[in-house]
Every structure is written in C-alpha cells, then in structure tokens.
Design a protein with these regions (language model features):
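Short, flexible helix-loop junctions that flank or precede catalytic/ligand sites
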Residues: 1-358
Length: 358
C-alpha cells in the first residue's frame, strides 16, 4: 500500500506473529469525506487448515468431495459470498492432493497462504501478469492440478473449463449462491454448453453460521412453526433444539463458526440437461433430486438438530429468492412462518419496552 496516497481505495497485507502463531492481516482502505476508512480481516490459517474433515461436512458430503478429488480431470468449484470460507475449503482440498508426484500450480490474487509443494503464482496486473496470461503459460507447464483463485470474468471461465477437459483437474471459486445459480452464471459467461456439461465435476456451495458454545447451549422444545419446518424439509419430527445462552467462555452463546454446505456431484442426467438446454425448472429438479443433493437449508437444519448452530443463524443465511424453487411452496411457507413468527415476537417485545418506559 502507498502510505502517501489517501485519495484511492487500496488493498494490502500484513504478516503478524502472535504468541507463536502466524497471522495474515488483510487491509482494505476506502477514502471517505471524513478520511480513510480501514477494515482489517484477521486470518489464522494454522487453525483453518486442520484438514478437510474438520470443516463441518456431513459424512455424505465429505465422501462426495473426496470422490470429486479422485477425478483425473474436470473442474471443481467452491461458491459463496465474500468471507464464506471458500479459500479455506480450496486450500484444504489442495492439502489432500499435495504429493511429491503431483504437479500443482496456482494462480492467485493475492496468494492467501504459502504451502510447501505448490507452485504458486501471484497475479501482478500492473506489469501484465493477469489471470488469463498466467493460465495460458500454466498449460505449458505440464500441471496435474490447477488452482485459480477466483473466476472473475468470461475469459477466465472459458480458459478454466477448456483446461479441465484437456487432462487437468481445476479447482476454483466463484461468487454465486448455490449449485443451480453456478451453472447459470457460467453459461452467462459464454462458456459453451457442450464444454460445461463435459467439464463440470462438482460444485460446493457454502455459507458460514455462528457455532453454538458447547458449554452453555441449552435445549428447548421446538415451536409449532419450527416443527412444521423440520417436517416439511427433512420429514422428521424434532421435539427439541438448542438455544444460545452465554457464559464466561463465549459471552454471547456462540464460539467459532460452522459452514453449511451443498455438494453437487454431476451425473450424466445433469450433464445432458446442460448440453441440451432444458428448462430451468427441469434442471432444478435434476440438481436437487433427493438422492443427489442436500440443499443448504437441509444441511443447516441437520446442524441445528445436532446442536451445532441455532435456527436463528440458519434463517439469517438462507435466501428465499435463490434457495427455493417456484414449486417449493410448502417449504417456503414453513420457512416464512418462522420469519413471520419472529417478526411478531419482536413487535410484541418492542411494544412491551415502550409501555415500560411510559
């Protein structure tokens, strides 16, 4: 970062050793009328790279990811919003693939974590070393695995897909909400349907929730709205779930974060559907077939049942516009019932507080 420049937004990084732990600090500055606004993200990869098995995947989803990583070629995409743990998931997958016999090359902006055994390239656009230039050169380096930090534009998407069908396993991230949305986004980026249908191996969509403190969490009976939601989505009768309480270890009832996952392994039916340009709702039905993919909502509800998080946290990260199909009327109503009930309770609470002040 240029310390003499305060008129332009800037990004930078700081390495900090804290009690023997190497922390990466990501700094972002934004010029405002009152001066520079600074945000610092604190990244502790010593904790986050404890292994793929520690990232909160259910047994079923974990096996799907491992199956995808055994493919000799194809493209595996990790999707989600900024700060949803995509990089941690990608690096954890690279850990599994990283052997002396495997030529792994990454192209990143920035290189988020240095790993032994990887050939990591830092993008420097100011001298012409951008994603596309680097990717073309990487293809001449005889790689087994290519990791692209992020698919940001049409050309990068096309190069990544073409690389994956020429004998390379490609890992990357993209800012989309779920599996279906990812397929649509890649098609919007002018990736040819026949190439995408052949190349796409798996899509891992994820979001982060606060994790319940195991010391102070407290069980309580489910409400009628919650029972309805569990029944409609999981077809389960759930008599009780956990609430956040707060103690001297966590202060607010939560300690750490846990990921919600949606893992799609593409089968031949989905590949054919992409190539043949079938209707969106038909593609949705294939993607979210009960025997194929568990949605983010389903994964979230499972983690509520096992006491990992709360229904309030899952409700925060589920998007009604993208996480439900047009035909999921009963599930939408059950989900909305929880939201409406929460609004009603908040209204009554606010009314009570106003009356108390009179």
């Amino acid at each position: 970062m240029n310390i003499t420049e305060s008129r332009l937004p800037q990004d930078g990084a700081i390495k900090h050793l804290d009690d023997g732990k190497q922390l990466d600090l990501r700094v972002s500055s934004l010029p405002t009328i009152h001066g520079e606004k600074i945000v610092i993200r604190i990244l502790d990869y010593s904790m986050s790279l404890a292994g793929l098995e520690t990232l909160g995947f259910t047994d079923e989803n974990y096996e799907k990811v491992k199956t995808a990583l055994t493919a000799p070629n194809g493209i595996i995409l990790v999707t989600g919003a900024t700060g949803s743990g995509k990089s941690t998931t990608v690096y954890s997958m690279l850990q599994l693939l990283n052997t002396p016999q495997t030529n792994i090359i990454t192209v990143e902006d920035p290189v988020e974590m240095k790993m032994k055994g990887l050939n990591q390239v830092q993008v420097m656009s100011e001298i012409g070393l951008d994603f596309n230039t680097t990717l073309r050169s990487i293809l001449r380096q005889d790689p087994n695995v290519i990791m692209i930090g992020e698919i940001r534009d049409d050309e990068t998407a096309r190069i990544a897909v073409r690389a994956s069908i020429t004998g390379h396993l490609v890992l990357s991230t993209i800012h989309t909400n779920n599996s279906l949305n990812t397929i649509e986004r890649l098609l919007d980026m002018d990736v040819e349907r026949y190439l995408l249908g052949s190349a796409l191996t798996a899509i891992i969509s994820q979001r982060l929730c606060k994790k319940l403190c195991p010391k102070c969490r407290k069980s309580r009976p489910t409400t009628e709205y919650e029972k309805n939601l569990f029944k409609k989505v999981l077809n389960k009768d759930v008599p009780a779930i956990y609430d956040a309480i707060g103690c001297d270890e966590c202060f607010n009832g939560y300690k750490g974060r846990i990921a919600l996952h949606e893992v799609l392994l593409l089968n031949q039916d989905i590949r054919d559907a992409i190539i043949n340009n079938i209707k969106k709702e038909e593609l949705r039905n294939l993607v979210y077939d009960k025997d194929n993919t568990k949605t983010l909502l389903e994964d979230g509800l499972v983690k509520i049942i096992n006491g990992s998080t709360t229904i309030e946290e899952v409700v925060k990260v589920i998007d009604l516009d993208t996480d439900f199909g047009e035909n999921d009327v009963e599930i939408r109503n059950a989900f909305l019932g929880k939201e409406l009930k929460k609004d009603e309770e908040n209204f009554k609470k606010e009314q009570s507080e106003i009356i108390d002040t009179l």
